[in-house]
């Protein structure tokens, strides 16, 4: 006689067996229970083997998914371009703009042009710039000094260590730019590559290094693969990513850090306002770039964009409150921060005049590309622009040279406030057509190949 408990157990076994049959049939596999019955194996053992195989298969599939997610992101060959978005003649008139730009031409023809002057001048003028005087380098010549070791060697001599540093990691070619190592090097990490991106240099552009010709893509890959969210200088790396891969929503660093545009925005906003290069202004410029590109590439969620807008709006409020009656700012532009006011004795290495030119020019530059919703009242940039025009007009030639990197931001800002690139203004005044795209001739044997050692990731500055 079969008990009620035995009957229930038998029904349960039959039910479980039918569920397994259905699941296996749905998966397009043979029923393990029927296979077991045919082969004489216990049903339980076959089911366990099938489940183990399924779990192992899912684990393998998920591992492959994770590995694919961590593959380096692919950039675009052509960079995005940041555009001037307003024309406000009260900030600077046509006549004033012509006068300013004439004084700020890149008159660097001759031996040993400082590389930080060259890369600042390139992003200021663009590769299209041509000038009528013999002492000024054209935009093409400026770019060649940064991307062709032959031109660099001609200017700096064979004994100078090369600016371009080629190497490989496995089968991946790399190019680094020698940085913070004297007048023949760049002054900031990734500044040169960001400048090349801003003037529209494609990643297939040929770079003539001491070790041979390589595409600019090798410099991008080095920046991407060496990047860390804890770098001491990350503003220009952020700009490189924004311009060459704005369509990429997230990626992983080689350290395993997940990077999104929101993560980068928070990184830019988390420091004290005046901290960082040029009293924090390059972080503000990068945020303004993000907002402009967000309109096309949807970098942010609505909430993240609102957070960046609110941050920059607060910055503009502070700038309105701290603007000098004459129209300028200096290193104390943020006013009082969460940990107190800026120190009264704050002064940069080039003195108060340099600080004022730096802070005012940089401020007008990021405002020139920012959306209306973050800008201050109309009179604030007008006063700043008119102060810059008067101050630049009063500088001696020696002071122009001394402050050139600061002034490159001021000149570019003033042109952008008239809705044009500096090279376009020169073309309007001279009647000369902007220079078209030019690429260097094939490489020739070069020196210093053995000296072109690639800096390691450990050499990156940390905060």
Report residues per predicted region:
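Preference for long, amphipathic alpha-helical scaffolds in soluble/luminal domains
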Residues: 20-22, 28-463
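N-terminal intrinsically disordered, acidic low-complexity segments at the extreme N-terminus
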Residues: 2-29
């Amino acid at each position: 006689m079969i008990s009620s408990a035995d009957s229930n157990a038998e029904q349960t076994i039959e039910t479980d067996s039918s569920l397994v049959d259905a699941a296996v049939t749905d998966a397009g596999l043979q029923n393990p229970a029927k296979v077991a019955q045919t082969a004489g194996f216990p049903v339980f053992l076959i089911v366990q083997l099938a489940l183990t195989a399924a779990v192992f298969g899912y684990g393998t599939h998920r591992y492959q998914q994770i590995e694919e997610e961590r593959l380096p992101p692919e950039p675009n060959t052509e960079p995005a371009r940041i555009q001037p978005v307003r024309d406000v003649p009260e900030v600077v008139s046509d006549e004033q703009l012509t006068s300013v730009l004439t004084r700020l031409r890149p008159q660097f023809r001759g031996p040993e042009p400082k590389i930080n002057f060259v890369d600042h001048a390139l992003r200021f003028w663009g590769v299209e710039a041509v000038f009528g005087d013999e002492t000024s380098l054209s935009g093409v010549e400026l770019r060649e000094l940064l991307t062709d070791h032959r031109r660099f060697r001609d200017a700096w001599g064979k004994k100078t260590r090369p600016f371009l540093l080629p190497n490989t990691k496995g089968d991946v070619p790399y190019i680094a730019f020698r940085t913070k190592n004297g007048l023949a090097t760049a002054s900031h990490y990734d500044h040169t590559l960001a400048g090349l991106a801003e003037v529209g240099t494609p990643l297939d552009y040929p770079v003539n290094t001491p070790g041979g010709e390589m595409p600019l893509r090798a410099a991008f890959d080095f920046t991407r693969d060496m990047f860390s969210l804890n770098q001491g200088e990350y503003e220009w790396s952020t700009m490189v990513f924004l311009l060459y891969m704005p369509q990429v929503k997230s990626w992983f660093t080689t350290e395993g850090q997940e990077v999104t545009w929101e993560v980068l925005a928070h990184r830019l906003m988390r420091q004290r306002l005046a901290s960082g290069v040029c009293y924090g202004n390059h972080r503000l410029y990068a945020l303004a770039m993000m907002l402009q590109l967000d309109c096309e590439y949807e970098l942010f969620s609505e909430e993240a964009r609102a957070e960046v807008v609110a941050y920059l709006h607060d910055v503009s409020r502070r700038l309105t409150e701290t603007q000098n009656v004459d129209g300028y700012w200096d290193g104390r532009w943020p006013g009082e921060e969460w940990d107190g006011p800026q120190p009264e004795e704050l002064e940069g290495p080039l003195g108060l005049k340099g600080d004022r030119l730096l802070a005012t020019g940089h401020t007008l530059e990021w405002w020139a590309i920012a959306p209306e919703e973050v800008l201050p009242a109309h009179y604030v940039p007008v006063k700043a622009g008119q102060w810059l025009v008067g101050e630049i007009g009063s500088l001696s030639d020696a002071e122009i040279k001394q402050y050139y990197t600061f002034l490159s931001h001021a000149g570019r800002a003033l042109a952008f406030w008239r809705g044009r690139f500096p090279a376009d203004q020169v073309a309007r005044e001279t009647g000369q057509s902007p220079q078209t795209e030019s690429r260097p001739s094939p490489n020739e044997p070069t020196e210093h190949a053995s000296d072109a050692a690639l800096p390691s990731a450990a050499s990156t500055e940390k905060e």
